[in-house]
């Protein structure tokens, strides 16, 4: 198996000012491409430190990836360090400089004088286009080894690395399928599938769970076993298909927007404890404007009454966190927006506000098209976890409703 190493560059990483998301992403991707990552190191913005690390690792690995330090400032030293170690010159690429300037002009009226540094290319390097930012990457082949320079911001690095994956894939590449579930506990899912998952030794099985993506069942094998894994997935879906919301990179909100489009339904949401989180998830999906009419954040009781038409008597008798309140919220929202389907959320996110009857984490969610489908939940976790789980469960309930189930 080929070996790889990663050098993440930036003093801000060493000082703990930002998380090293690039290392996590690259380690996962390189494993799938058939590499064994033997080292991940973080180096500050220092020419000697970067150069020494590059020189050391080039003796040990087949693929070396450096991230960060490709900007225009004097402390962006990755190009200089690699050129120094390889004993190659840095040359100004005029065509590249023009492209960089054109990108910058779209967002800034003035071009920084030091921008030329981003157009310095190591002799013999292939320039890698950056579709998001201004800092291009570079790829070099050195005695059969590959050296790749990528920018530091993950939103720039990820699409640039993805564009290289076909070129980097090895004979030891892995085939992986990730199945995603939300409303079924990890232990229950594993119990349902144990005869399928653990009666074989060809596919590596891993389950992960969090409050954002729910339960993820990750199945990994070598590419030569692709057909075996595909058959295994079919058996899994025969048992758990109704609980599945997505595969691999699919997000819950993307699935919901697609289902709304397929069924030609419009959506509006009324939120209390989630404070616009549900709306934000939906509008993050490209094309959501075709189906999403809008949302109301009715945090106070006054807004619930005056905007959504929740009755004073309902609030006094049952409270804002109640089945009756969320049902009146969706009814009022339907009158207000004319949406085909309305969803409302009201709950106690904490840390205060709970009672013995309605402790912190109590959340009501209602879906209303022709009749109400109302659910009560008792979520655990801190304030942000409760709010996130509420928004995600609203999407999960809506997904099930759109898939045709009478009850969620």
UniProtKB/Swiss-Prot annotation:
SUPFAM superfamilies in the record: CinA-like, Molybdenum cofactor biosynthesis proteins
Alphabetized Pfam families for the sequence: CinA, CinA_KH, MoCF_biosynth
InterPro entries the UniProt entry points to: CinA, CinA-like_C, CinA_C, CinA_KH, Competence-induced_CinA, MoaB/Mog-like_dom_sf, MoaB/Mog_dom
Domain of life assignment: Bacteria
Transmembrane segments: none
Stated family: Belongs to the CinA family.
Stored NCBIfam families: cinA_nterm, molyb_syn, PncC_domain, PRK00549.1
Protein's name in the database: CinA-like protein
Species of origin: Thermotoga maritima (strain ATCC 43589 / DSM 3109 / JCM 10099 / NBRC 100826 / MSB8)
């Amino acid at each position: 198996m080929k070996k790889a190493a990663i050098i993440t560059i930036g003093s801000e990483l060493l000082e703990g000012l930002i998380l090293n998301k690039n290392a996590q992403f690259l380690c996962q991707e390189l494993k799938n491409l058939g590499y064994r990552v033997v080292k991940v190191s973080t180096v500050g913005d220092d020419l000697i430190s970067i150069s020494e690390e590059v020189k050391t690792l080039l003796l040990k690995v087949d693929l070396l990836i450096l991230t960060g330090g490709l900007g225009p400032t004097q402390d962006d030293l990755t190009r200089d360090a690699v050129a120094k170690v390889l004993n190659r010159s840095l040359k100004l690429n005029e065509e590249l400089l023009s492209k960089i300037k054109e990108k910058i002009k779209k967002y800034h009226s003035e071009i920084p004088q030091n921008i030329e540094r981003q157009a310095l290319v190591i002799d013999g390097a292939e320039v890698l286009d950056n579709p998001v930012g201004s800092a291009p990457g570079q790829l070099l082949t050195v005695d059969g080894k590959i050296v790749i320079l990528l920018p530091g911001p993950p939103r720039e690095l990820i699409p640039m690395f993805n564009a290289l994956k076909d070129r980097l894939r090895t004979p030891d590449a892995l085939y992986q399928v990730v199945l995603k579930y939300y409303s079924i506990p990890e232990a229950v899912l594993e119990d349902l599938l144990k005869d399928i998952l653990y009666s074989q030794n060809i596919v590596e099985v891993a389950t992960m769970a969090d409050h954002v993506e729910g339960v993820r069942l990750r199945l990994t094998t070598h590419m030569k076993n692709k057909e075996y894994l595909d058959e295994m997935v079919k058996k899994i879906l025969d048992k758990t298909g109704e609980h599945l919301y997505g595969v691999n990179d699919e997000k819950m909100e993307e699935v919901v927007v697609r289902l709304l489009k397929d069924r030609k339904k419009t959506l509006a949401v009324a939120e209390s404890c989630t404070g616009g989180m549900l709306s934000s998830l939906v509008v993050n999906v490209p094309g959501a404007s075709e189906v999403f009419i809008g949302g109301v954040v009715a945090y106070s009781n006054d807004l619930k009454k005056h905007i959504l038409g929740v009755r004073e008597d309902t609030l006094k008798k049952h409270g804002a966190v109640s089945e009756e309140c969320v049902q009146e919220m969706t009814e009022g929202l339907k009158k207000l927006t004319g949406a085909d389907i309305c969803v409302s959320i009201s709950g106690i996110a904490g840390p205060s506000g709970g009672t013995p009857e309605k402790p912190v984490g109590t959340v009501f969610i209602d879906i209303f098209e022709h009749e109400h489908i109302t659910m009560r939940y008792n979520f655990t976790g801190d304030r942000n976890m409760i709010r996130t789980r509420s928004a995600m469960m609203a999407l999960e309930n809506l997904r099930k409703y759109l898939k045709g189930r009478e009850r969620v």
